[in-house]
Regions:
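Ribosome-associated RNA-binding proteins
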Residues: 1-137
């Protein structure tokens, strides 16, 4: 599964989880981090283009942002909120490319595919991918 295949959201998103057996679990551990309170500045992460972001990429961005904020402001010096939720199912119709594969696969017949990952669609200049408030200037 390559990320470039799922970067653009073509067509209607598929989010009907009740019809699929073996749904992938969401990899995002927490949607809020730090300590709630009043803060001086707000740092926001926004997207430059309309795209789909996989849940693994959202989790890695959250981890790196929280680590950077924790190093500069301390454990209780910030509060971060993740505003997007990956609810779109990404499916893949796996193809076998070895000798004798024509006897094992059906090609495009019954090509619904298996659910392999989750993603969130983000619009251009969407300001709520992540928001962090901190007491000091970062």
């Amino acid at each position: 599964m390559h990320g470039g295949c799922y970067r653009t959201g073509n067509g209607q998103p598929y989010a009907r989880k009740e019809f699929i057996k073996g749904k992938p679990q969401i990899k995002i551990a927490k949607f809020q981090g730090g300590k709630k309170g009043e803060y001086d500045c707000i740092v926001q992460l926004c997207s430059n283009e309309k795209t789909q972001i996989r849940h693994m990429a959202i989790e890695s961005a959250r981890l790196s942002a929280n680590k950077a904020l924790e190093q500069t402001t301390g454990e209780t010096g910030y509060f971060s909120v993740l505003r997007i939720y990956p609810h779109i199912l990404l499916r893949e119709n796996k193809m076998i490319a070895t000798a004798g594969a024509d006897r094992l696969q059906e090609g495009m017949r019954r090509a619904f595919g298996k659910a392999v990952s989750l993603a969130a669609r983000v619009k251009t200049d969407y300001m709520e991918i992540g928001r962090a408030s901190c007491r000091e200037r970062v």
